[in-house]
Amino acid sequence: MYLIVGLGNIGEKYQYTRHNVGFLVIDEMAKNLQTSNVNNSNFQSTLLKSGYNLFAKPTTYMNNSGVAVHSIKEYYKIDLENIIVIHDDLDLPFGTVKFKIGGGHGGHNGLKSLDSHIGKDYIRVRIGIGKPQNKDDVANFVLSDFSKEELNKLEDIIKHTINAIEALKTADIDEVKSKFTLK
């Protein structure tokens, strides 16, 4: 079983923000699959199931994502190598998609929470959102909406990311890196 987690913040006002790119990928994946809702308030997530895949959007807000993912991981006894986390990355230019296992949180509070609750060795799908011109403006930047131009490009980036996630279930991460990394 795979647990595919999109990081983001709940609420309509955050729907198309840079910080919610993980949620956007999960939403698009769910559109193309037959899914059923898993109702369990202990999971603190919107959780969908399709075959041997679980798709989670933690409802704890970004900074406590690890609490939600930990409860799902423990309940379903999912190994870390079968957890795929999709998140925004300030250190990558907009539209870049990269993959890795483990590593630091790079100041990302969602990853920081995950690392402290489940460990670090899960699969990370990093989607570049670019950086603000002023370093002091990071919080406002990640919580701002994508521009129209970015949203137009994002559709293809999300489709590409979904194909990569499907490949991650059957291929070695190095194969996925060489085939699906977008720069």
UniProtKB/Swiss-Prot annotation:
Residue(s) at site: Discriminates between blocked and unblocked aminoacyl-tRNA: 9
InterPro entries (UniProt xref): Pept_tRNA_hydro, Pept_tRNA_hydro_CS, Pept_tRNA_hydro_sf
Top enzyme category: hydrolase
Residues the record lists as binding tRNA: 14, 61, 63, 109
Keywords: Cytoplasm, Hydrolase, RNA-binding, tRNA-binding
Cellular component GO terms, alphabetical: cytoplasm
Locations listed in the record: Cytoplasm
Keyword Hydrolase: yes
Residues marked Stabilizes the basic form of H active site to accept a proton (site): 88
Active site, per annotation: 19 (proton acceptor)
NCBIfam families listed in its UniProt record: pth (TIGR00447)
Stated family: Belongs to the PTH family.
Name of the protein described by the UniProt record: Peptidyl-tRNA hydrolase
